[in-house]
C-alpha cells in the first residue's frame, strides 16, 4: 500500500459550519479539529480561512466537480504550498481565494490584506496604457499615484511600453506589470500561482528576492512545481487529488506523498 492508502485517502472533513466568536477579547485563530471534523471561523480573526469550498463547472457532458469540500487556514506570516498534479484544481483554488472566481459553495474568510494572484493580468483594462492601469489600481488601494508608478516602472523594466495600451503587450510583459504592481502594495498575504518565469536569470533573481527575501514576513499561498522553493520557504502543504484536499503540517511528509501521486 502506498502513502496515500496509509493516510486514508484525500476525502475532506465533514461539512463545517461558520461560527462567530461570542467570547470577550481577541478571538482564537481558526483551526481544523481533526477529531470532530469541523472548521470554526471567527470572522474578525487575523487569518485566511477556507470552509468546505466546492467548485463545479458545467460542461457539454455534464457537471465537473473540480474542488470538493476544501478546508484550511493560513495564519499571519505562515506559508502554505498547494500541491497536486496538472488538473488537480490548484489554480482554480488560488482564484477562489483571491476572489477572481466565486466558489459554487463554501466560505472564504479573508482576515488579512491579500493580493490578487501574482502575475495575474486578467484584471487589466486592455485599452488603457500600462501607466493608466497602474494609476487606476493605485487609486482603488489608496496608494500615492506617482510613487506607485515609479515603483512599478523600476521593477517591471518595461520602459516606454508603459505608455502603450496593455493590449499591445506580450504575455510576459503583462506578467511583469502585474507582478510589479502586486509588489507595490503592502499586502499581508500573497497568492502565488507559479513564481514568474519570464525574462532572464537576473530578472528571475530579482523577483525571487523581492518576494521571498524582502517580504519573508508575509503570509503566502504558493502553487509551484519547484520543490526547492517549497522546501525553502513553506511551513506546510495542502495536497489536492481528484477534487479532494488534505493539509499536512509535516512538509517533508507532504512532499513525499506528492511525489507518489
At which residue positions do the language-model features occur?
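A short, flexible loop at the N-terminus of ABC-type nucleotide-binding domains that lies
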Residues: 33, 37-50, 54-73, 79-81
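ABC-family P-loop ATPase nucleotide-binding domains
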Residues: 60, 113, 118-201, 209
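Helical segment within the ABC ATPase nucleotide-binding domain
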Residues: 204-216
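Conserved beta-strand-loop-alpha-helix hinge in the C-terminal portion
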Residues: 244-261
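Conserved H-loop
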Residues: 217-223, 226-232
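ABC ATPase nucleotide-binding domain signature region
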Residues: 79-81, 85-139
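Conserved catalytic segment of ABC-fold P-loop ATPases
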Residues: 232-239
Amino acid at each position: 500500500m502506498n502513502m496515500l492508502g496509509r493516510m486514508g485517502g484525500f476525502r475532506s472533513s465533514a461539512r463545517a459550519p461558520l461560527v462567530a466568536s461570542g467570547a470577550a477579547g481577541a478571538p482564537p485563530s481558526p483551526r481544523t479539529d481533526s477529531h470532530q471534523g469541523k472548521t470554526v471561523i471567527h470572522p474578525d480573526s487575523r487569518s485566511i480561512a477556507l470552509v468546505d469550498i466546492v467548485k463545479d463547472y458545467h460542461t457539454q457532458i455534464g457537471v465537473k466537480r473540480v474542488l470538493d469540500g476544501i478546508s484550511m487556514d493560513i495564519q499571519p506570516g505562515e506559508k502554505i504550498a498547494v500541491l497536486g498534479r496538472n488538473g488537480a484544481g490548484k489554480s482554480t483554488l488560488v482564484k477562489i481565494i483571491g476572489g477572481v472566481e466565486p466558489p459554487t459553495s463554501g466560505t472564504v474568510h479573508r482576515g488579512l490584506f491579500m493580493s490578487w494572484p501574482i502575475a495575474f493580468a486578467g484584471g487589466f483594462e486592455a485599452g488603457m496604457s500600462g501607466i493608466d492601469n497602474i494609476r487606476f489600481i493605485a487609486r482603488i488601494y489608496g496608494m500615492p499615484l506617482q510613487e506607485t508608478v515609479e515603483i512599478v516602472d523600476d521593477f517591471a523594466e518595461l520602459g516606454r511600453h508603459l505608455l502603450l495600451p496593455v493590449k499591445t503587450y506580450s504575455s510576459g510583459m503583462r506578467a511583469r506589470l502585474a507582478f510589479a504592481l502586486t509588489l507595490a502594495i503592502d499586502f499581508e498575504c500573497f497568492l502565488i500561482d507559479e513564481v514568474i518565469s519570464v525574462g532572464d536569470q537576473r530578472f528571475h533573481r530579482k523577483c525571487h528576492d523581492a518576494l521571498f527575501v524582502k517580504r519573508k514576513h508575509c503570509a503566502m499561498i504558493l502553487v509551484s512545481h519547484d520543490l526547492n522553493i517549497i522546501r525553502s520557504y513553506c511551513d506546510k502543504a495542502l495536497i489536492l487529488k481528484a477534487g479532494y484536499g488534505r493539509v499536512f503540517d509535516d512538509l517533508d511528509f507532504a512532499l513525499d506523498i506528492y511525489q507518489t501521486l
